[in-house]
Regions:
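Flanking helices and flexible, charged tails adjoining ferredoxin-like Fe-S electron-transfer domains
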Residues: 1-17, 56-63, 70, 91-177
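N-terminal cysteine/histidine-rich coordination modules
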Residues: 2-27, 31-51, 56
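Acidic/polar residues at beta-strand termini and the immediately following turn/coil
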Residues: 23, 81, 89, 111-112
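Glycine-centered helix-boundary capping/hinge motifs
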Residues: 31, 76, 95-97
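Acidic (E/D-rich), amphipathic helical modules within compact regulatory domains
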Residues: 37, 45-91
Length: 177
């Protein structure tokens, strides 16, 4: 096996062990988002919006047993995954705000679920070159980091998917201990 191939494989393996870590509490303290994303397919779009949406939805959504927002969507743009987290199909969404109006808790705000969006690829191309994602290198408060997440996660850290871990204080139902 060639040396270059071995390095490429080890770099890819290392990239798979690390996750994008978004601290929503720190991120909320930032007066304005200065994070810019050079998402390959949408160079003019801030791809971080997609990561923030995904992170926020995983901790803000009340995960209703029978989510009304999903059933009222005329374009079937919302889907509830096995973990109860809502996922939005951006190409199906027409921005009608039916989901926002139907949400009994008021957590699906148009500001949280923007119409124009891209899908973050976690800068996988940069990871193969052993570089961090652009949002990580630019975030002034280090609310977005790229780090190893091995073993049991600290309290209030939530795995959203294989590349994303979110830190946020979760909501609690009233009367439930």
């Amino acid at each position: 096996m060639a040396k270059g191939t071995k390095k490429s494989e080890s770099t890819t393996a290392a990239a798979k062990k690390r996750s994008l870590f978004v601290d929503l509490e720190v991120c909320a303290k930032c007066p304005q988002c200065v994070t810019k994303c050079t998402y390959f397919y949408h160079p003019g779009n801030n791809g971080v919006v997609s990561v923030r949406e995904h992170a926020a939805m995983s901790v803000v959504c009340r995960r209703c047993e029978n989510p009304v927002c999903v059933s009222v969507c005329p374009r079937e743009a919302l889907e509830r995954d096995d973990g109860g987290v809502l996922r939005r199909y951006v190409m199906r969404c027409v921005g009608c705000k039916s989901c926002s109006i139907a949400c009994p808790f008021g957590t699906l705000l148009p500001d949280v679920v923007p119409y124009a969006n891209s899908v973050c690829d976690y800068c996988l191309g940069r990871l193969q070159g052993d570089e961090s994602p652009v949002c990580v290198t630019i975030c002034p408060l280090q609310a977005v980091r790229f780090e190893e997440m091995a073993g049991e996660l600290p309290k209030n850290n939530h795995v959203v998917d294989e590349h994303l871990v979110v830190h946020a204080i979760p909501w609690k139902k009233e009367g439930v201990k």
